[in-house]
Amino acid sequence: MAPTLLAAEGKDRSEFVLSPSKRTDSKLIVPKNNGLKITGTFLDEISHDIPHQNWGEKEWDLDFQHMKRIGIDTVIMIRSGYRKFITYPSKYLLGKGCYMPSVDLVDMYLRLAEKYNMKFYFGLYDTGHYWDTRDMSWEVEYNKYVIDEVWNTYGEKYKSFGGWYISTEISRNTKGAIGAFHTMGKQCKDVSNGLPTFISPWIDGKKAVMGTGKMTREDAVSVEQHEREWNEIFDGIHDVVDACAFQDGHIDYDELDAFFTVNKKLADKYGMQCWTNAETFDRDMPIRFLPIKFDKLRMKLEAAKRAGYDKAITFEFSHFLSPQSAYLQAGHLYDRYREYFEIK
């Protein structure tokens, strides 16, 4: 509009710029609040393939406030260490050649969880040997010491210490997986007087292509084979693993209902809780990894609700859903999520 016309109408250009307090909500043409709300998130501080945000306690405190605002009550440290990088000054792991961290992140997360009335799940140590060799014996051996050390140092000190995450990830009935999960799960429960444990495997679907340079694959697992293999796994671990949160990003959106129905049926059969790990990053992009398009997240959460899942957690809030993420799109996703779930 020409300046003379603006002046003639007695208007100032600033009137056309909305402040955040006056921002107009999106006019959704789908039903609102029709999915399973995210109530838990992983904390990806030992980053494997995502850039580190270099936050201090001030930034983490603010992020916990953002989490609390949308109803997150559970935070899960995805791993307490990966190869030589660790999250707390573990005497055992330092003795094995790991690097000394500058901050005790386990203590910080437990304090923040206590401050904001959340439960903290401790993720076990990842040696890296399993990814190199597919041999799980290293994970069992190292975590024998880590589990005891962590419980003695933090478990009895903080009421926010709410459970354990067995961080080894599988998708199929990998050799030795049942025994390894059972051993680690049992030790976690024994040492902590029965605190809950969970796993978060991936579904070996068409998007399970890490390391191949491709976007999809042809030899994806069928729903029937997935059911057979996970029936066997659950049969062997259900007495020491309380919940299973399948990652939801490796299958296509029109496959969600079929796989989710099977997952819930198996969990119910073995008395386990069925969670979804709703990935808030986008596997359909050639760039690893950026915040997901809102409609993709919406469809996944709606499928989880249709299947009757017990809880939705995400990987992960701080990079892909937080208003203070290094990715600008994450804050916009936070806004779209709040609009959809009618969170003020």
Model-inferred region functions:
Residues F16-K344:
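Glycan-processing catalytic domains of CAZymes
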